[in-house]
Each structure stands twice: as structure tokens, then as C-alpha cells.
Design a protein with these regions (language model features):
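N-terminal Rossmann NAD(P)H-binding glycine-rich loop of SDR-like oxidoreductase domains
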Residues: 4-25
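Adenosine-cofactor binding site in Rossmann-like domains, unifying the SAM/SAH pocket
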Residues: 31-49
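NAD(P)H-binding glycine-rich loop region in Rossmannoid oxidoreductase-like domains
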Residues: 44-84
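NAD(P)-cofactor binding segment of oxidoreductase domains
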Residues: 76-101, 136
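Conserved Rossmann-fold NAD(P)-dependent oxidoreductase catalytic core, especially the SDR/UDP-sugar
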Residues: 90-123
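NAD(P)-dependent short-chain dehydrogenase/reductase
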Residues: 137-184, 191
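Mid/C-terminal beta-alpha module of Rossmann-like enzyme folds, strongest
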Residues: 172, 193-195, 202-245
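C-terminal amphipathic/interface module of NAD(P)-dependent oxidoreductases
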Residues: 233-238, 244-270
Length: 270
């Protein structure tokens, strides 16, 4: 097997740590960028920064994880969201074509026609979703590949991700309000990372696909099942309804292939 240099942008994020581990487990070399840490700690929106990073790290392929993902931040700064979520991935696609896998989100959909296949038309409700949808178009127009991801969970030392944040709140006896009317197809971050690495090293794959967990669940059901699996007190989970017009109600995805493990096994691995 040929060992590749895989550039991972946004490596300091929740998914980034899992991807680095998956890259190394597969026998490849991880070279990283992040806003706050990494081999190249950079703001990729800066003039010429994508080219500078590529020149410095000389990757064979790219996994582009970096994003502006907080919905409120994107609503406040839509131009910044477009720069981060659309223009930066476009520049990587111009350089790498099919040797780029750029991540997108289930929030490019409006939640009215789930479950969504990769061929379903996008209809984002938020500035975040709009910027990611634009990024998808720009990447694909330049021969790059796009992978849409659902809600991710799994262990994290900094308490990030759906399950780690819940565990921290319950252990601190803090109430977590969880939506009963918002549905996703949650996927363990380690499973997502392994699939992403397998995709990026095979540049002949499809230009657009979905990764997703094996079950459609509400945020509240996710919390209950996670708490039960780990013996945590579910009284700190408060069921509530989402009333935010910018949040789609059901963005469950049809995965490109079946999940490697069932949902309970994923929950146990947190």
C-alpha cells in the first residue's frame, strides 16, 4: 500500500481528532491546519493562504473539514460564512479536483421531504446552510468531491460533539433542552472518519454522497438512549419543541452504504 500525505483542514475540531487517528491507522501521513493549532495554524480565507499551505505541506490529497458552523455566527456574518464555507473549498477544488473531499451538512435541506438521498434538491433555510450549499456547487464545478454529514457524536476530551456535551451537562446536573420534533441520522465520528479516509484515498469515487447513521432519531430520543446506555440520570434531559424557523425539522439522510455498526454499538462507544 502506498502511504499518502493527507492534508486535514480544521484538524483541531471535534471530527478532526478522529480523522487524524483514522489516517494514521490506515498507514497514511496526516498533515494538518487549524485556526488555533496544527502544522499550519492559519486563516485559510486570507489572500493566497490556500496556495501557501499546499506549497508548505505538499499533500497528495485533501480532507477539507474546516468550516464556519455556528448558525448564529453565520446569520450575523453571512459574507464571512460564504468566504469560509464556499470560497475556501472552491480554491482547494481548483488545486486538487477529485483528490479533494470537502465536507458539507444535512442542513442544506429544508426538512420537508426526508429522508434525503444525495440526488435530492437542496433548499437551505439558514445562512449556514446556504453557504455550505454554495460551497458544494463550487467544489463540484471544479471536479472536487462533496460528502454530506449528519449530526456527529463520540468521545471527546474537550466535551464537543452531541454525546460528550450531554455527558458533561448531566454530570454537572445541568438541564439540557432537547428537541422532540427535530430528526437527524446521527453517526459516530470514528465511523465517519474511517469512511472519509477510505474515500479520499480513492479519487475515482462519486462527486456527491451522504454518510449517515443507521437510525432516524429526534434529539430527545438520542439523549434518552445515550443516557440509558451509560447509566446517566435522564431527569436532566428536558423535552422541548424547536420553534426556530432556521432549523429544519427532519434532515435524515439516505447513506451511500450501510453503517458498519448498529446504533446501540455506536452509543456504547462514547
Amino acid at each position: 500500500m502506498v502511504s499518502l500525505r493527507i492534508l486535514i483542514t480544521g484538524a483541531s475540531g471535534f471530527l478532526g481528532g478522529h480523522v487524524i487517528a483514522a489516517v494514521r491507522a490506515a498507514g497514511h501521513v496526516a498533515c494538518t491546519t487549524a485556526r488555533r493549532s496544527g502544522e499550519a495554524a492559519v486563516d485559510l480565507t486570507g489572500p493566497g493562504m490556500v496556495d501557501a499551505v499546499v506549497q508548505a505541506l505538499r499533500p497528495d490529497v485533501v480532507l477539507h473539514l474546516a468550516a464556519m458552523a455556528r448558525l448564529a455566527d453565520c446569520e450575523r456574518e453571512p459574507a464571512r460564512a460564504t468566504a469560509v464555507n464556499a470560497l475556501v473549498p472552491q480554491r482547494f477544488a481548483e488545486r486538487f479536483g477529485a483528490r479533494l473531499v470537502s465536507l458539507s451538512t444535512d442542513l442544506v435541506f429544508d426538512g420537508r421531504w426526508a429522508p434525503y438521498s444525495a440526488l435530492a434538491p437542496v433548499a437551505p433555510l439558514s445562512a449556514y446552510g446556504q453557504s455550505k450549499a454554495e460551497g458544494e456547487e463550487r467544489v463540484r464545478a471544479n471536479g472536487g468531491r462533496v460528502v454530506r454529514l449528519p449530526l456527529l457524536f463520540g468521545p471527546d476530551a474537550e466535551g464537543r460533539g452531541a454525546s460528550a456535551a450531554l455527558r458533561t451537562a448531566i454530570e454537572r446536573r445541568q438541564v439540557s433542552a432537547l428537541f422532540t420534533n427535530e430528526y437527524r441520522t446521527p453517526l459516530h465520528a470514528a465511523d465517519a472518519a474511517a469512511q472519509l479516509v477510505a474515500l479520499v484515498v480513492e479519487p475515482e469515487g462519486p462527486l456527491l454522497l451522504h454518510l449517515a447513521g443507521p437510525e432516524r432519531v429526534s434529539r430527545y430520543e438520542f439523549g434518552l438512549r445515550f443516557a440509558r446506555r451509560h447509566g446517566l440520570d435522564a431527569k436532566w434531559l428536558q423535552p422541548t419543541e424547536c420553534m426556530d424557523a432556521l432549523r429544519p425539522r427532519d434532515v435524515s439522510l439516505v447513506a451511500a452504504w450501510p453503517a458498519a455498526r448498529d446504533f446501540e454499538a455506536m452509543l456504547a462507544d462514547c
